[in-house]
Structures are given as structure tokens and as C-alpha cells.
Regions:
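A conserved structural motif in NAD(P)-dependent oxidoreductases
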Residues: 86-97, 108
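Short C-terminal tail/terminal secondary-structure segment
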Residues: 32, 102, 113-127
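Short, small/polar-rich loop/turn modules that mediate ligand/substrate recognition or access, typified
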Residues: 59, 64, 112-114
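Conserved SDR Rossmann-fold cofactor-binding beta-strand/turn motif
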Residues: 64-74, 105, 118-120
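A short, exposed helix-loop element centered on a Lys and neighboring polar residues
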Residues: 7-8, 52
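A short hydrophobic alpha-helix cap/turn motif
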Residues: 15-16, 58-60, 73, 105
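Catalytic loop of short-chain dehydrogenase/reductase
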Residues: 23-46, 51-60
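Alpha-helical segment proximal to the catalytic Tyr-Lys
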Residues: 12, 56-57, 110
Length: 127
């Protein structure tokens, strides 16, 4: 997985510097698997698990990792039936995902690590 490869490359450097933050962009399928995308769902769940392990391993060095799990974003078209299933009745925007990533990478999120952040307009029903 690319997430693991990147973490293995930069994690030790960040730990040595006693600071660092990584944000992975995944999908809401990590929380609600889809029969249409079974392999993707399994891999995304693995990324979520890896994030928690990474946070436990390098948290002492002030190195953080979090995941963003977007729903349907308007950079990729969705049909009307799909959009009608989203409680906010619209797709998200790349800017909304970027704002969340910016926050998670900032010092304002210094105590947040090992977490999944769903940004899907209320589509995901899992708790």
C-alpha cells in the first residue's frame, strides 16, 4: 500500500524531528463496504487500521496520521439517484475536502491522531 510506503519513508524522519502530520485520502467505503467495490472496501479498511497502528507507534514523537473518508465529490459525476440518497442532496467539493485536510495538518489539530473523518453530506449510516 502506498500509505505504508510513504509512512515508512517519512515517519522516521518526522520522529527524529519530533513533529509531523500525514493525512490519507481514502473513501467512506472504509466504514460502509460496498458489494460493487469489494477489494477497494477491504483495502480502505486496512488503511484505517494502519493509521491507528501508526498513531500508536509514533504518537510519542508528536507524529500524527489521520484519514479523510470522502463520499461523492463533484470532481466525479454521480447520477441523480445517488445524489438523492445524500441527506444534503448534493455532492461535496474538492475545496471542502481540502479544508478538512488543511485543518488536520495544522497545529490546531495537534491532539488528533489515528482517526477517520467522514465527509459525505450525511450519507454514511455507520456509527
Amino acid at each position: 500500500m502506498n500509505v505504508v510506503r510513504l509512512a515508512r519513508l517519512v515517519g522516521p524522519i518526522m520522529a527524529k524531528q519530533k513533529v509531523g502530520a500525514l493525512v490519507n485520502i481514502s473513501t467512506f467505503g472504509a466504514k460502509e463496504p460496498s458489494l460493487s467495490f469489494p477489494i477497494s472496501s477491504v483495502i480502505r479498511a486496512a488503511v484505517s487500521s494502519y493509521c491507528k497502528l501508526f498513531a500508536s507507534e509514533l504518537g510519542h514523537a508528536n507524529v500524527r496520521m489521520n484519514n479523510i473518508l470522502p463520499g461523492f465529490i463533484n470532481s466525479y459525476p454521480a447520477d441523480k439517484q445517488t445524489i438523492n440518497q445524500i441527506p444534503m442532496l448534493r455532492q461535496g467539493t474538492p475545496a471542502e475536502v481540502a479544508e478538512l485536510a488543511s485543518f488536520l495538518l495544522s497545529d490546531k489539530a495537534a491532539y488528533i491522531t489515528g482517526q477517520d473523518f467522514v465527509i459525505d453530506g450525511g450519507l454514511t449510516k455507520s456509527i
